[in-house]
Amino acid sequence: MKEIWETLKQYFGDGFVPGSAPLRYEMHFCDMKEPLNKKQSMRYGVEIPEDAMPLFSVLGDTCAPPCSCQDISGVIEHIDRYLENAPIRHADDYTITSGKDDEDINQVSLYIMRDTLSWWVHWGGSLHPNNYWKLIYVAFAAIPDDVQVHPRDFIDGTYRFLGHSWNDCLNGLLAEGVPSDQVKLAEMTLWRQMATQYIEKVDPGLRSLLVSKTTLMTQYRVMTANTLGCAVLLLASEGVIVGDLDDGALEMASIAQCLSMDMAKEALGVLEGEKTETVAGDRRQLKRELRWLYVRCMKYLDAQPHAEFLRRFASSGLHYVPMMDRYLERVRGHIRFPIRESVARILEPFIKREPTPNKSGREADHIAQVVNEPITVAL
């Protein structure tokens, strides 16, 4: 794990905060100013003006948060110390963390694929076959939410998603025509996500450093979601090749996408009490600060290239949360909706049903076995 962390540090480097690698941010969002000239780009996505937010009882007014961005270097130092003596494995590896009535990892994976396709279409993506591996990538980015996968197992192919290894996905992205430097960026953001999510689950001392600090919590939370890597591939699906470590628009879109989701989850009543709740503490004040940050990210995107894609992606949480089964299952008491036959037909092509080489030892139980089993559908 320490080797992975050091590799990430070398790739990303520091952002505007010295000592922040690999949790790099190029832009200091506390200092963002409203663009001087508004463009018609504000018509893309869901635009809720800051002065109109109090009209909605599930929203309210805004307030600038105290800047805690510089504290990210302290978080890095904490993680460095933890990794010095961290065990190679944890007893909870491959534990299902969805909080729902899942029977096994294979079932979780099917539901993750359902959720992936749902997110993608809300972001504005197409289910065209040429996006197959981009969708598998998003699924890989979603699985650590619901299963505690060790990053090493993800990288070396011990863990497979519906029969697909990470190397399969890498080769597939290149075959779909995604430029190699964009594939590398997407790969490294996914490695970073796997590492930060795993550390968040196994290090009991990390969360206390983040709670009640809106900008610091946001910095870490966006890394665990990997919305930046997903945005890179969404743009690639539209033939738009952008994205490097200095791309402020990608940063702001990835931040706003997480914030729009949290705002909608709070409106739906499913944010409070989450293990990784972003507004735990003085919830009323922290929600005001979160909305302040969201508004400024969206205003920044108004003046950026490709706003027609990025603003929809950034604000999409406001409409996918109340519509997607993933979140409605939480309203239902964390009970899964059965997979209907029509859904199973959509999911079937994403399952690799050829035999998968087995491995000896404890890893053998964690290679996806669904490859030879039909999808169970609701009658």
From Swiss-Prot:
Key words, A-Z: Lyase, Magnesium
GO molecular-function term, one example from the UniProt record: alpha-humulene synthase activity
Cofactor(s) essential for the protein: Mg(2+)
Superkingdom of origin: Eukaryota
EC number annotated for this UniProt entry: 4.2.3.104
Covalent S-S links between cysteines: none
Pathway connected to this protein: Secondary metabolite biosynthesis; terpenoid biosynthesis
Application in biotechnology: Eupenifeldin is a bistropolone-humulene meroterpenoid first discovered as an antitumor and anti-leukemia agent. This metabolite also shows anthelmintic activity against the parasitic worm Hemonchus contortus, anti-malarial activity as well as antifungal activity.
Deleted gene: phenotype: Abolishes the production of humulene.
General function of this protein: Alpha-humulene synthase; part of the gene cluster that mediates the biosynthesis of eupenifeldin, a bistropolone meroterpenoid that acts as an antitumor agent. The first step of eupenifeldin biosynthesis is the biosynthesis of 3-methylorcinaldehyde performed by the non-reducing polyketide synthase eupA. Oxidative dearomatization of 3-methylorcinaldehyde likely catalyzed by the FAD-dependent monooxygenase eupB is followed by oxidative ring expansion by the 2-oxoglutarate-dependent dioxygenase eupC to provide the first tropolone metabolite, tropolone stipitaldehyde.
Family, per entry: Belongs to the terpene synthase family. Alpha-humulene synthase eupE subfamily.
Protein name (record): Alpha-humulene synthase eupE
